[in-house]
Amino acid sequence: MQKATSNKSILRILSLALVLLILVGMLSVGVSAESASPLKGTSVTLGSELVVNFYAEVMDTQGAAMTFCIDNDTKTIPVTQARLVEDNLYVFSCAIAPAQMTKNIEATLVDSGNTYQTSTSVRAYAEKLFASKQWDKLAAGDMMVATLNYGAAAQECFGYNTENLANAGYEKAATAEIPQAEASQMVSGSVSGISFYGASLVFETRIAVRFYFTVKGNIEDYNFSIGETPVAKDNMYYVEVPDINPQDYAENITLTVNDKMTVTYSPMQYISRMYNKTENTQLKALIGELYQYHLTAVDFLADPYGNDKDNLVSAQ
């Protein structure tokens, strides 16, 4: 029989989750803790994807699994693909689209013949944290509100679940002015048969940059230094570079083709250009909140606890 993780140890691990996730380049805004069942708590990770993490004590470390259901879509994560935190405490992660922040995630853990269920949404998670009356004093509170504002803007832009906005009831800060991009994409060098066409920012279920190329001949003749497998679209190919964290939108991304042609681009260039160009008010609002989300993430990483770090506790 495996050693059970003590409640004290669990709370210590959960209270440290914020710092641990920051160290690997992602953001977390705290962990809500439970104690009565093997389902021990939840946290939210803000990286290139918005992820809700479910913490569970697992006895069958080979056969247990957790199933997530949201919007009638289901996904099962075996414990062998979950992240081990300590002893038999595992984290099962569910990525959602920003517009889904008010949709409940139904989580079902099957372990050693027993079934355990829980549910939460990013909005419900935020309410639980703020109910502690301390998180709203921390930089983590600002990060959570910026996240809800981003989610609400995505709902309105895509016409999704707009009767239940993520930021309903929360005071919305004025969106910071987005500066003009300092430079357009930069290209140096050349490779015969391939030309850079342009770049865009994808902000649907995850944040990514797409580099578009026109190609004469076989795409397999070209090697790209970063990114995923090239995808054909509209008589072109794009190479998608994922894992763009919100604090990094102003950082340049450099892609090299066959070690001869170099393309440099940053997500902020797209944000600035689209915000100042589009006449679609809902898209403009979404891009504005995405920019505010970026600024808040930068501040949060610089000082995650704000001026009230001595009062940091897990919401219970």
Segment roles from a protein language model:
Residues K8-L23:
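Sec-dependent N-terminal signal peptides
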Residues E34-Q316:
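Short, surface-exposed linear motifs at loops/turns and structural transition points
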Residues L18, L27-V29, E220:
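Generic detector of short, well-ordered, non-transmembrane alpha-helical segments enriched
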Residues M1-S9:
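N-terminal secretory signal peptides that target proteins for export/translocation
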Residues L23-S37:
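Sec-dependent signal peptide cleavage junction
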